[in-house]
Curated annotation (Swiss-Prot):
One of its GO terms (cellular component) is glutamyl-tRNA(Gln) amidotransferase complex. It is an enzyme of class 6 (ligase). The active site is at K76, S151, S175. Belongs to the amidase family. GatA subfamily. Its EC number is 6.3.5.7. Allows the formation of correctly charged Gln-tRNA(Gln) through the transamidation of misacylated Glu-tRNA(Gln) in organisms which lack glutaminyl-tRNA synthetase. The reaction takes place in the presence of glutamine and ATP through an activated gamma-phospho-Glu-tRNA(Gln). PROSITE patterns: AMIDASES. This is Glutamyl-tRNA(Gln) amidotransferase subunit A. It comes from Pseudomonas putida (strain W619).
Length: 483
């Protein structure tokens, strides 16, 4: 059963080939057996899952239908889950049990999904390798000596290893798309405001967006259907009707205009990945797409702008973790200042502390205009570049990452080397655009992804193109050895 996609599970539950309880039991046993090799889960919620599975079976027996009813899910451990630890991958929240469910968690539970657990992640979603977690690094199922990408590395590794068919992730600078590329999955970052951020522990509030990780575009469409929608509790949620994401998966690509930004194919890109990107372009041309070269002239400024804006927002968001109300508190503080200093110094890991300090510096009185304001101006230029490009093309295509997955620890001593792995994904967050990564082949036995970007609220078009591509290629069907 573990080989089934989310869509196949939906069909199997509908025609009573198996029950949700049987499926849940089988997947929980698989997690117990295989996850020690991967470390993809922080918490496994066995009792909760079996209870939800029985409830889903009862709802189905009473005549209820629904693609997600009784299907399994695991949540990245920054979505609040009522009564279940929500750690954000940090010592700071090791003992935090949220008193409520995040909107995404509540919506999927209402649809009847069964929560198998909470997945490992970079601490406070800060990282591209899932090595900064307080609970240890996650291993890539394609090669256990390599990273799975981050920050949604646990969500990606669990799906790639067939521990379950789909998971939730979040994407602030590529944290859904980059691990999807490095583990042979399909991952979608929706338009900013499409999926509620309420109950999602914030890293950078103007960039964070939740989305699905699965093996196929068809599965991402099903999961996004359950996640998307307006939420009055999130002031940045956008009241835009939610289309049926599965309805147009098979639509023709005849005449679809795809732009290849020349800036994506310069220095830093592994030439073997460039070849795989060109091969995927040829497949889309066979399906009727028209491809042309475009330019995104300000792209080279994206990483510096992002690493001012995101840490600045993080330094503000993470100020609430002070050892007073909830979360980690140091032992026997001498006074209030000592409580703050030691609780934060002991509770946050090195990468989180680094970003808080960078952000605090960028927001300080003498540097605010030179750094933060300048970064926001660059952000506007990057958005304008996309708006201009989309006047002449329907979608933008390029590599998801410049390199395949690297070895565990290889970039730990040089944070900037890891930051550069997000060079192609960051721009979509700065502009708020939807982006999707899909499997496009292998380099040295490690998966490679191709990224598609679309205008606002065009998630359906991204899923359509990825689905048509997956009908004529088989990269997405390949599984890692031993899983």
């Amino acid at each position: 059963m573990h080989q089934l996609t989310l869509a196949e599970i939906a069909r199997g539950l509908a025609d009573k080939s198996f029950s949700s309880e049987e499926l849940t039991g089988a997947l929980l046993a698989r997690i117990q057996q295989l996850d020690p090799q991967l470390n993809s889960f922080i918490s496994v919620t066995e009792e909760l899952a079996l209870g939800q599975a029985r409830a889903a079976d009862a709802r189905r027996a009473a005549g209820e239908t629904g693609a997600l009813l009784g299907a399994p899910i695991a949540h990245k451990d920054l979505f609040c889950t009522n009564g279940v630890r929500t750690s954000c991958g940090s010592k700071m929240l090791d003992n935090f049990k949220a008193p409520y469910d995040a909107t995404v968690v509540a919506k999927l539970a209402e649809a009847g999904m069964v929560t198998l657990g909470k997945t490992n992640m970079d601490e406070f979603a800060m990282g591209s390798a899932n090595e900064s977690s307080h609970y240890g690094a996650v291993k890539n199922p394609w090669n256990l000596e390599h990273v799975p990408g981050g920050s949604s590395g646990g969500s990606a590794a669990a799906v790639a290893a067939r521990l379950l068919p789909a998971t939730t992730g979040t994407d602030t600078g590529g944290s859904i798309r980059q691990p999807a590329a490095l583990t042979n999955l399909t991952g979608l970052k929706p338009t900013y405001g499409r999926v509620s951020r309420w109950g999602m522990i914030a890293y950078a509030s103007s960039l964070d967006q939740g989305g699905p990780l699965a093996r196929t575009a068809e599965d991402c469409a099903l999961l996004l259907q359950g996640m998307a929608g307006f939420d009055a509790k999130d002031s940045t949620s956008i009241d835009e009707p939610v289309p049926d994401y599965s309805a147009n998966l098979n639509a023709s690509l005849q005449g679809l205009r795809i732009g290849l930004p020349k800036e994506y194919f310069g220095a830093g890109l592994d030439p073997r990945i460039a070849e795989l990107v060109q091969a995927s372009v040829k497949e889309l041309e066979k399906l009727g797409a028209v491809v042309k070269e475009i330019s995104l002239p300000n792209m080279q400024h994206a990483i510096p702008a992002y690493y001012v804006i995101a840490p600045a927002e993080a330094s503000s968001n993470l100020s609430r973790f002070d050892g007073v109300r909830f979360g980690y508190r140091c032992d026997e503080p001498k006074d209030l200042t000592d409580l703050y200093k030691r609780s934060r110094g002991e509770g946050f890991g090195a990468e989180v502390q680094r970003r808080i300090m960078v952000g605090t510096y960028a927001l300080s009185a003498g540097y605010y205009d030179a750094y933060y304001v300048k970064a926001q101006q660059i952000r506007r230029l990057i958005k304008n570049d996309f708006m201009a490009a989309f006047e002449g093309v329907d979608l933008i295509l390029g590599p998801t990452t410049p390199n395949p997955a690297w070895k565990l620890g290889a970039k730990s001593s040089d944070p900037v080397a890891a930051y550069l792995e997000d060079v192609y994904t960051i721009t979509a967050n700065l502009a708020g655009l939807p982006g999707l990564s899909m499997p496009a082949g292998f380099v040295d036995g490690l998966p490679v992804g191709v990224q598609l970007l679309a205008p606002y609220f065009q998630e359906g078009r991204l899923l359509n193109v990825a689905h048509r591509y997956q009908q004529v290629t088989d990269w997405h069907t390949r599984a890692p050895n031993g899983f």
